Amino acid sequence: METIFDVKNVSYTYVGKINALNDISFKVMPGEQISIMGSNGSGKSTLLTLLDGLIYPTLGEFYAFDNEISEDVFDAIKDNEFRSYFRKRVGFVFQNSDVQLFSSTVYEEVAFGPLQLNMTLEEVKTRVMEVLEMIGITKLKDRYPHTLSGGEKKKVCIAAVLANNPDVLLLDEPTAGLDPRTQLWLIELLQELGKVGKTIITATHDLETVEQISKRAIVMGEDHRIVVDGNVETVLNNRELLLSTNLIHEHMHVHGKLVHDHLHVHYREHIHEH
């Protein structure tokens, strides 16, 4: 079976010697639904950016579809055949939709990817209209993307990625800033995409989202290392792990003679321990 991603002892340091990833290793197989979990600053977004081939390891090795992803073999050769192959198979939905939107209309935004695949204009039109209908934004096709609401922008970004029909979807904090209805829509969409065999990797600290869209959790600590790589249910039920990685927190309350811990958890009601 093909290996989607193989990350081997990867570290990444930003300019100024700011360490973001520290000796990271894991593999991703086809059809997996994975959440990269961690508090703000743990490196999960950096890791997702690396998986999309936008940055390269400072140390270690990163392979996608059995090809090394590095500046020498991936970025330096602009007409690299594998580069085009990679971009066809991997789609990235950024946390900030405005970073991703650059076309003058929603239609053109969604059409941009298919146009790079040398499809005919008629084929592009068919593909775009199919995706717009699937996402439920056909009525927005002539709108300027930056006039849309946050939820509408997110839908356009997802439509633009899905227009290429990628095998792998990378999503950075996909539910951040969305209203409850749009969050539910997105979760249900990711569930359906998982059922048809898409490989879905999400970076998030929203534990409720993790529980609903992933089967595997990679938890990153504040030292930018992987703390745990395992089953989602097991991870979410590990209170000490969630506390130590700053994914939940607790404080003490006093009510008369009663003292109890107040545990704040993103994916469930507050838990009182007497």
For the regions a language model picked out, list residue spans one by one.
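ABC ATPase C-loop
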Residues: 161-162
